Design a protein with these regions (language model features):
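Juxtamembrane intracellular "pre-TM" segments in multi-pass secondary transporters
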Residues: 1-6, 184-213
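Helix-to-loop junctions at the C-terminal end of transmembrane segments
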Residues: 59-71, 260-273, 357
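Residue-level signature of mid-helix packing/kink "hotspots" within the transmembrane helices
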Residues: 53-61, 145-146, 254-262, 346-351
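Cytoplasmic helix-loop-helix junction between adjacent transmembrane helices
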Residues: 104-141
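Symmetry-related core transmembrane helices of the 12-TM Major Facilitator Superfamily/SLC fold
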Residues: 163-180, 366-382
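A late C-terminal transmembrane helix in Major Facilitator Superfamily
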Residues: 330-359
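Short amphipathic helix-loop junctions that connect adjacent transmembrane helices
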Residues: 29-43, 227-246
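Structural signature of the two symmetry-related core transmembrane helices
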Residues: 74-88, 275-290
Length: 395
């Protein structure tokens, strides 16, 4: 990796960290903000948050696909500008509808940045560097989510608007970093490999369909597992013990990701992807079974969370490698945009968990999640078979 590419990569990783700190400092407190500023009831807040998050994911799909037609450096700068504008606008407006729309803009912009960031890595890095850098980026995201919420807690005690201003300030530095150090993406001509940029390609690629469905199910299991666990513990115990469990599970998850993500992710390659993804699935299942038997033991909750997190550590770079492998040159952002639909799995987890916990035995929740992650693994294998692994992506 030459000096220019190393600077560009470092600038993008730092930008990813800062933007995530800003988002982490605000997202957990949006419910408090809507309640305190606009006196919304709990159910209305739930509707507002769901609408904003869903709009963000859906629109990021379209904007992410279009990113393949433009310079990715400029596209990331535009996404960060929209991200910062949303945070600046929310404290200044006095209309709940506008607040929800600006929050949707923030989520859309963040998703677009994440998609284009992956595409930039895929276009500019060597095959041996991609999974290593993506693992580092995933570590940066987890560090951001570790720093952001406590920082937001300190600020919200001073003023409900301060977390939004912090997020806007955090956005300013990435704009500077990217403008100065990130090199422009060279236009990739896909016709040399027989493929032409077209959204229709996404609909015709069976491997992409299977991988996206697999990502949806995997996200459903791991994307919101902390809230899922808290819902479960509140049913079998009480709110106080739920807080203790979450206080154990989240630090274990963050510590495991920060310390192991790079060392595990860098070992992923086409030769061992199936074996490692199978091992990751097994870790998910063992962790979920462990949750069932953890009961009142915080030690067992922590140990189960550690095993569960190993599955997450393997799946994150593994899913990236699968999509990068099948995406034709010049359509990386389009493919990562389609993959981002899988994030909707995490969005519906709290709703489904609530229904399961009120309708079935509480332990049924983790049995269902174990079956879901096994289904995700099966769909992932179908995707690999649909596109011969180890061969160039063809359309």
């Amino acid at each position: 990796m030459n000096l220019s590419l190393r600077r560009s990569t470092s600038a993008l990783l730092a930008s990813s960290l800062l933007l995530t700190i800003g988002r982490g400092a605000t997202l957990p407190f949006m419910t408090i903000y809507l309640s305190r500023q606009y006196s919304l009831s709990v159910d209305l807040i739930g509707y507002a948050m769901t609408i904003a998050l869903t709009i963000g994911v859906v629109f990021s799909l379209g904007f992410g696909i279009l990113a393949d037609k433009f310079d990715k450096k400029r596209y990331m700068l535009l996404a960060i500008t929209a991200f910062a504008s949303g945070f600046i606008a929310i404290p200044l407006v006095n209309n709940v509808t506008l607040v929800v729309l600006f929050f949707a803009l923030i989520n859309c912009a963040y998703s677009v940045f994440a998609i284009v960031l992956k595409a930039w890595f895929a276009d500019n890095l060597s095959s041996t560097s991609k999974t290593k850098i993506f693992s580092i980026n995933y570590t940066m995201l987890n560090i951001g989510w570790t720093i952001g919420p406590p920082l937001g807690t300190l600020l919200v005690m001073q003023s409900i608007n301060l977390p939004f201003w912090l997020a806007a300030i955090c956005s300013a530095f990435p704009m500077l970093f990217i403008q100065i150090w990130v090199k422009r993406s060279e236009k990739i001509i896909a016709t040399e490999t027989g493929s032409v940029w077209s959204p229709k390609v996404l609909l015709q690629d069976k491997a992409l369909l299977w991988f996206t469905c697999s990502g949806f199910l995997a996200s459903f299991v791991s994307g919101a597992f902390a809230s899922c666990i808290s819902q479960y513990v509140m049913v079998i115990a009480d709110g106080d013990f739920a807080e203790k469990v979450v206080a154990v599970v989240l630090p274990v998850n963050a510590a495991m990701v920060v310390t192991l993500q790079y060392s595990v992710g860098r070992r992923l390659n086409p030769a061992n992807i199936r074996a490692l993804m199978t091992a990751g699935t097994l870790c998910f299942v063992i962790g979920l079974v462990g949750f069932i038997f953890s009961g009142n033991s915080l030690l067992l909750w922590g140990m189960s969370a550690a095993v569960f997190t190993v599955g997450e550590i393997i799946y994150a770079p593994g899913e990236y490698m699968l999509i990068d492998h099948i995406a034709p040159p010049g359509m990386k952002a389009s493919y990562f945009s389609a993959q981002s639909l899988g994030w909707l799995g995490a969005a519906i987890n709290p709703l489904v968990s609530g229904v399961v916990l009120t309708s079935l035995q509480p332990s049924s929740l983790f049995v269902i999640l174990a079956l879901v992650i096994i289904a995700a693994w099966v769909l992932m294998l179908k995707g690999i078979r649909a596109r011969p692994w180890g061969q160039p992506a063809l359309c």
